Design a protein with these regions (language model features):
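Rossmann-fold dehydrogenase core element
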Residues: 260-262, 272-312
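Mid-domain Rossmann-like dinucleotide-binding core that forms the NAD(H)/NADP(H) cofactor-binding site
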Residues: 136-219
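Conserved acidic E/D residue at the C-terminus of a beta-strand in Rossmann-like folds
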Residues: 196, 265, 289
Length: 350
């Protein structure tokens, strides 16, 4: 799928990817997905996105060729691709802030500034850092969300400074919010509260054990519910994943004083923080994007059965029908959460 400028995303042809740097690898895509960030690109809300590139940063595949400097990955490996590519050597990478890698091919490059994974093949810079081998006991679908949504959840839970038995509120019960909830639980949260106005998504989350309490703020007072759960304190950690004006307000109002509020969402409009109202809460806000450099640990968690994101994959399409998949995903029809898009051999050059 080629981004041709705001509002224009369509199938098209790209050049066959080739090794450009010794640290590169070429991955033949086997399964990919559509991310809400792809919709933001289509809407023209990502200024850094380069017209003419193939989008897509959620995918797994098989290594087809490697550069002379690649040592940890070999041809034929099944791999999950990290949504963030990073050199590992610049100031930001050395501190673990790989989203801000200063290399031209670093940070959010795939599917934004260079060709991504909604194509038959993709060039992956810094392959040793950015490709994670998939164990034999992990399927492509089980590994599919490793490089993006599960990495986002891991990052959000990590910088949220979750302590054992904390009450963690996640605003937004979509796929990213659920991955944040999964990782919060894995890092010791005592109670997960999912907040969303979409009852279908709240029911999905509860039916699969991703939350302990769900709140629909269109019919319930989220502040009051969480105060009742926490003896009047509020949530210890809040993750704002929904990306709207109302959801941002909910995030800081349900937080207890001195809580950490992690802004995971990507906003399409400026937001306002009413500082006079907030005065005295002493909140700490931490904002995205994800420093996605924990894929090896996440893959271990999947292999060991500590996390399972496969229930999120509710629909499957061949790549030849990806436009239908985009329509379903963007319109949130038929209870869709995530879509697995499998590469079929009828596709050529896209």
């Amino acid at each position: 799928m080629i981004y041709n400028g705001p509002g224009r995303l369509a199938p098209g042809d790209i050049d066959e990817p080739v090794i450009r740097e010794p640290s590169d690898a070429i991955v033949r895509v086997t399964t990919g997905s559509i991310c809400t960030s792809d919709l933001h690109i289509r809407a023209g809300a990502v200024p850094r996105a380069v017209p003419g590139i193939a989008v897509g940063h959620e995918f797994v595949g098989v290594v087809e060729s490697i550069g002379s400097g690649v040592s940890n990955i070999k041809i034929g490996d099944r791999v999950a691709v990290n949504c963030e590519t990073y050199c590992g050597e610049c100031y930001f990478c050395r501190h673990g802030w790989v989203n801000n890698c200063t290399d031209p091919n670093g940070g959010w490059a795939l599917g934004c500034r260079i060709d991504g994974g909604q194509a038959e093949k993709a060039r992956i810079p810094f392959a040793d850092n950015c490709l994670t081998p998939i164990p034999d006991d992990v399927s492509d679908e089980a590994a599919l969300l490793t490089g993006d949504l599960l990495s986002t959840g891991y990052w959000a839970a990590d910088i949220g400074e979750i302590e054992e038995r904390d009450t963690v509120a996640v605003v937004g019960a979509g796929p990213t919010g659920i991955c944040c909830a999964m990782m919060a639980r894995a890092m010791g949260a005592g109670r997960i509260v999912l907040i969303d106005v979409d009852r279908t998504r709240l029911d999905f989350a509860m039916n699969h054990g991703y939350g302990d309490v769900v709140v629909d703020p269109s019919s319930e007072d989220a502040d009051a519910v969480i105060e009742d759960l926490t003896e009047g304190r509020g949530a210890d950690v809040v993750m704002e994943v929904a990306g709207g004006k109302d959801s941002l307000r909910t995030a800081w109002t349900v937080a207890r004083p001195n809580a950490v509020v992690v802004i995971v969402a990507m906003y399409e409009e400026d937001q306002v923080l009413p500082l006079p109202e907030m005065y005295g809460k002493n909140l700490v806000f931490k904002t995205g994007g994800v420093d996605g450099c924990h894929c090896a640990e996440i893959m271990r968690m999947i292999s060991e059965g500590r996390i399972d994101a496969t229930p999120l994959i509710t629909h499957r399409f061949p790549f030849s029908r990806i436009e239908e998949a985009y329509d379903l995903f963007s319109q949130r029809r038929d209870g869709v959460m995530k879509i697995a898009v499998t590469m079929d051999r009828r596709c050529s050059g896209v």
